[in-house]
Structure formats: structure tokens, C-alpha cells
Design a protein with these regions (language model features):
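Short, acidic/polar
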Residues: 59-74, 141-150, 217-229, 312-321
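Hydrophobic faces of well-ordered beta-strands that scaffold small-molecule active sites
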Residues: 49-55, 80-82, 115-119, 160-162, ...
Length: 547
């Protein structure tokens, strides 16, 4: 081969190889951004219920409210988000009116639903300025209200969300969003709620998606970053995003401060990780796609627009993606059952029912994804709080047999032989989180009827040793029991041998798809081959040309 030809082919191979290498890296980053490799660590209040619903109940006709709550429960929803306005409950400094809040809370409890209560909207006597959602002039006024609320309803309420959309001017009473002022409000309110209800879980306000960086609106990720810089992290337990899909579906994997899409939640998650707060979950206080009916004559949607069939499909696909890829995501509250808005308001495009109360396709999609009986990638405690006043019990999908006991510590093996646990998971691996100590006991584990492939075996099967290595020192550890499984559904069976009174089983972690599937490895190999061949041809061609 002539040197000039060899050099030309070398340059071509080298260029193509580098191009493929760059494209492969970009595709890998986009495809796996936001995922967790290996076994996800314990993150409280993540996982199921993955799907909730926003309801606007305050001031609603009581019969309509009770009917709506029952219909929502029949869809399989167990957790709802509801706004209770400070302005209506404390209209004057020394005047309290709990009557409507009492009715709302009683109806929610009667329907068997768990509320996430959103507190906000200053009364005129306390407001910094006149207008909806105006912040208080003195944060301590709001904190005193929140403490009174928690003292009154703390036995019924676990989750409290402090304000809504403080990063927008409409969420801050028409004023300029002020992270420092919100941080002060959050600190005072969180401390007051926790003083009245030590078990309270505090949610950061839902941060609205916007690409603006001031002065009137501040990007969600930037507002969150400033809260961390202001030292507000100890005042909240959960971050809340609003990953509306706008005009693209849940598989739009662009993660960009200038792009509004479902993947925008990853931007906020990356801020949390950057500030060392990855041990907390991210929830979605609002999300969804807007589908106004054909012939709509009201105001246009500012959230993009899809048709009803696409809306329903996107809801299903979004939940599937979250369960498969985002183990850090907790409950996502779909917007909404029905808006508290006139009939020409575009928020009706999010509604699960039409103005006549008929279910829309989105409601059926919600029903299809509401119950997560299969454990998807993420961490799951062995026991979770049950209905108010009934302690702890198994998470949905876990089938315990025998004399197991449940508490905040996990699941405790009974004294009699025969305690078993079965569940189905979707993923590529399983790890058990166990409490080892100075006792002799084992858990025998099989996956799809075969001994778990990461455990030692004896005649009975694959076993996990519950005795701590030095016998005397108790420890809680996550032990991989099965890895390298094909991604899909797998059935686990666990049998306990001894170990009562030790609360041995703390939880389990499901591994998802790894960030290196075959087709990307192939592309990487071809690109490296092209680079290598191109480099060799180029060098040998140059050597020949000099002779």
C-alpha cells in the first residue's frame, strides 16, 4: 500500500474511531445519568408508594370531598398531598378556626389515606405584603401556627411540607424569590413542628421548574443550591421537585439547566449529591403531562400539550422508568385529581376526571401503576409503619410466613422453626441488610428455585451467616446474596434457622441494570479498534513516506 493511501486511511480510521468513542461516551452519560450502580444504599422514605395524587380538599363540598377520596382510594392510591392554608385557619392573631381543617382531616382518615400536608399562605395580619402565598413578615408567626397544627394533628400526620414554589414570584406573594428568607422560614417552622411532633418528616417546598435565574423567578436547582450554601440542610428531610414532562415524554434524557422535561429531577438530585445529602430522598410534589380536551376554548396550557392517550402512556412509562432507574425517588404526586379552578383553566388538562366527574384515560393509567407489588431497583426496609396506631408490618409484596415480629428495627425471627419470606423483584441482583451479633443463626436464600449465587452452600442450600465476625460486636451490614442475574422478574425465598430476638432482617436492596450493557461495550471496542488501526496505519505510513 502506498504511503499516501496508508496515511489517508489511517486518518479516516482514527477520526471515525474517535467520533464513535465520543458518541459512545455521550450516549452512556445520557442513558445512565441519575442511576446508582450496584446495590442502592438505604434511603429513608424512598420506594413505595411511588405514586400519590394531589387533591384540593379545603373548602370543597363535604359530599364531593368524601366521594373523591373514596374514588382515589379505589384507584389504589394510599398517599395524597393536600394544601391547608394558614390564612383560613388563623385569620387574626388571636383567632383560630380549625373547623374546616378538622373536617378535611377526618375525611382523609376515614378514607384510609395518608396525607402529606402543605402549609402556607400568610393571613393579612402576618403577611409581608398583600397577595396569595405572601410570606410572613416574622417567620416565628408561621412557626407558631405550624406548631399548633402539629400539636393538633400530629397523631394523624407524618409528612409536613413547608410552603410551595418559593422560587417563583407567584409563590412568594409577588415579591422577589429570596432563598435566605425561605431558609429562615424553614428553620423556624421545622424546629416548631419537631418540638410538637418528634416523629415529623419535613419536606422542602416543591420547587417549580424554570430556566430563569432572577430576579423574578429562580431556577429550581439554583434555589436548592443556595439553600445548601445557607446551611438549611438540617431543616428538611426530603427535597421536592416538580418534574413536569412538558412537550416530551419520560424517555427524554436531556439533563440541562436550559431544558424543562421529566429528567430535570436529576439536576436537583445532583445538587443533593454535590452537597453530601445523597442519604435523603427526592420526591415529586407535582408531575405529569397536560392533555386538554379536543376543542378546548379556555386559556392555553403553559406546561406543553399532549393528547389524552399520550398522557396516559407517558404516566405509565414515567413510573416504570423511576422504578427501574431512580432508587432515590420517593412518592411522586401526580397533578391532580381535579383542580380547584374554573372550567376554562388549563389545569383541567392534568385532571384525572373531567368537570362532570368521569374518569379520564390518565386515571386508568394511574390505577395500573399505583401498586408496586414487585420490588424494583432500590432499598426496602423489612418492616414499614402501618395504618395510624397499628405499629409496623410487612411492606406490600413481602409474604412473611410464621411467627415473625415487626418494628422500626426490622423483622424478628420467631422461636419456632418455619419462618419464611417470599417476594418477587425486578432487577439483576439482591442484597440483604442484616443485623449480625453474638448469636448463631442463618438465613437460607434461593432465587428462582436455585441457591443464591453469592453465598456459601451446604446440603440444605445457600446460607447467610448472621453471627458477627468477632462474635461480640453487633453490626448492621448489607450482604450481596445474588448478582449477575438477567434483568427481569425473579422470585426469592428466605428460610430462617434460629436467630429469634435479634431483629436480624433489616431490609433488602435490589440492583438494577448496570451502566455497561453489551451494545455499548461493542461500540466501545469498535471505536478503540478504529483508533488503534488508524494510529498504526498513520505511523507506518509516515515512516514509509520518509524513506
Amino acid at each position: 500500500m502506498r504511503p499516501v493511501v496508508r496515511i489517508g486511511i489511517g486518518w479516516l480510521c482514527l477520526s471515525l474511531g474517535l467520533l464513535i468513542l465520543g458518541l459512545t461516551g455521550g450516549i452512556l452519560r445520557a442513558r445512565w445519568r441519575g442511576t446508582i450502580a450496584g446495590f442502592p444504599p438505604p434511603i429513608p422514605w424512598s420506594g413505595e408508594p411511588r405514586v400519590g395524587l394531589n387533591l384540593y380538599l379545603f373548602g370543597q363540598n363535604p359530599e364531593d370531598r368524601r366521594r373523591d377520596l373514596q374514588q382515589v382510594r379505589q384507584l389504589g392510591i394510599s398517599r395524597i398531598r393536600v394544601f391547608l392554608p394558614w390564612s383560613a385557619i388563623q385569620p387574626a392573631r388571636d383567632q383560630w378556626d380549625w373547623s374546616e381543617a378538622d373536617r378535611v382531616m377526618v375525611d382523609i382518615r376515614a378514607a384510609g389515606l395518608e396525607p402529606v400536608v402543605v402549609l402556607g399562605d400568610s393571613p393579612a395580619w402576618a403577611a409581608r405584603r398583600i397577595g396569595p402565598m405572601a410570606p410572613p413578615l416574622d417567620p416565628e408567626d408561621f412557626a407558631r401556627f405550624a406548631r399548633a397544627f402539629a400539636a393538633r394533628y400530629g397523631s394523624w400526620v407524618r409528612f409536613y411540607q413547608i410552603w410551595d414554589e418559593p422560587n417563583l414570584t407567584i409563590g412568594w406573594g409577588g415579591g422577589t424569590p429570596d432563598p435566605a428568607a425561605y431558609a429562615a422560614l424553614l428553620r423556624a417552622t421545622a424546629a416548631a413542628i419537631r418540638a410538637a411532633d418528634p416523629d415529623a418528616v419535613i419536606l422542602l417546598a416543591g420547587l417549580a421548574p424554570t430556566v430563569e435565574q432572577g430576579p423574578w423567578n429562580l431556577a429550581d436547582w439554583l434555589f436548592l443550591e443556595r439553600l445548601y450554601q445557607l446551611g438549611a440542610r438540617e431543616s428538611f428531610d426530603i427535597v421536592a421537585a416538580k418534574p413536569y414532562g412538558f412537550d416530551t415524554g419520560p424517555e427524554d434524557r436531556r439533563v440541562d439547566p436550559e431544558v424543562l422535561n421529566f429528567s430535570r429531577a436529576i439536576l436537583l438530585r445532583e445538587v443533593m449529591v454535590r452537597y453530601g445529602d445523597e442519604g435523603k430522598p427526592l420526591w415529586a410534589s407535582h408531575w405529569g403531562w397536560n392533555a386538554l380536551p379536543p376543542g378546548w376554548s379556555g386559556r392555553p396550557s403553559i406546561w406543553g400539550q399532549v393528547d389524552e392517550a399520550t398522557q396516559a402512556r407517558y404516566i405509565r412509562e414515567a413510573v416504570e422508568r423511576v422504578r427501574r432507574e431512580w432508587p432515590w425517588m420517593g412518592t411522586m404526586f401526580l397533578e391532580s385529581w381535579r383542580p380547584d379552578a374554573p372550567s376554562d383553566d388549563p389545569r383541567w388538562g392534568f385532571a384525572m376526571v373531567d368537570p362532570r366527574g368521569r374518569l379520564r384515560p390518565a386515571a386508568e393509567a394511574l390505577r395500573a401503576v399505583a401498586n408496586g407489588a414487585v420490588f424494583t431497583p432500590g432499598y426496602y426496609p423489612a418492616a414499614i409503619p402501618q395504618a395510624e396506631g397499628s405499629g409496623y408490618g410487612p411492606p406490600p409484596g413481602a409474604q412473611y410466613e410464621g411467627a415473625w415480629r415487626f418494628s422500626a428495627l426490622g423483622a424478628d425471627i420467631g422461636r419456632e422453626e418455619g419462618d419464611r419470606l417470599r417476594f418477587t423483584f425486578e432487577g439483576t441482583g439482591l442484597a440483604l441488610r442484616v443485623r449480625r451479633g453474638g448469636y448463631r443463626a442463618h438465613l437460607y436464600v434461593s432465587v428462582d428455585g436455585q441457591p443464591a449465587n453469592r453465598l456459601p452452600r451446604d446440603a440444605r442450600g445457600a446460607y447467610l451467616i448472621l453471627t458477627s465476625p468477632d462474635y461480640a460486636t453487633p453490626e448492621v451490614v448489607t450482604v450481596p446474596v445474588a448478582e449477575g442475574l438477567p434483568y427481569g422478574l425473579h422470585t426469592v425465598r428466605i428460610e430462617a434457622e434460629r436467630g429469634w430476638g435479634q431483629w436480624a432482617l433489616v431490609g433488602w436492596s435490589i440492583a438494577g441494570v448496570g451502566p455497561d450493557p453489551f451494545r455499548y461495550r461493542l461500540a466501545l471496542a469498535l471505536s478503540l479498534l478504529g483508533v488503534g488501526m488508524g494510529g498504526w496505519l498513520l505511523v507506518t505510513g509516515l515512516v514509509q513516506a520518509r524513506r
